[in-house]
Amino acid sequence: MSKSAVGKVLKLFTSKSGTSQRFEQKRLSLDNFGVLDDKFYNKNTERSVLVSSIDSYKLIQTYGIDMPFGYLGENILMDFNPYNLDMGSRIQIGTTIIEISQYCTICNHLAVLDVKIPTLLKDDRGIFAKVKEAGEITLNDSVYII
């Protein structure tokens, strides 16, 4: 039985120590400790990858707020919304398999751009995942629920 893609990767980001800025990438390498070259690598493997949906950005835009991609702190931005998947659900992207480990909470730093953002994104910021199979993710890779 062949699997069908549910979406694709739109943007990839890493973060660096000493700054909250996100750096756009063309490819991410992941292992069991998280995203290589990311400041959160090997910090908390249960929360080593942050995945967000374009739907979060569209929601904020409906309120007239221009929020730049990467602002949610995501490593992976995709056009599929994984927020309603169960904990333990597995997602294959590129050669990597990740497992949903936690629903993302809202951080107060999101209010820096606009004070309404934390309230608007209460349940729609993203998901944390842990890496189950190391590999690479590139822009436009397909997303599969496995």
Predicted features and spans:
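Short, solvent-exposed secondary-structure boundary/capping segments
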Residues: Q21-E24, N108-D114
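Short, basic/aromatic beta-hairpin or loop at an interaction surface
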Residues: Y63-N75, A111-G126
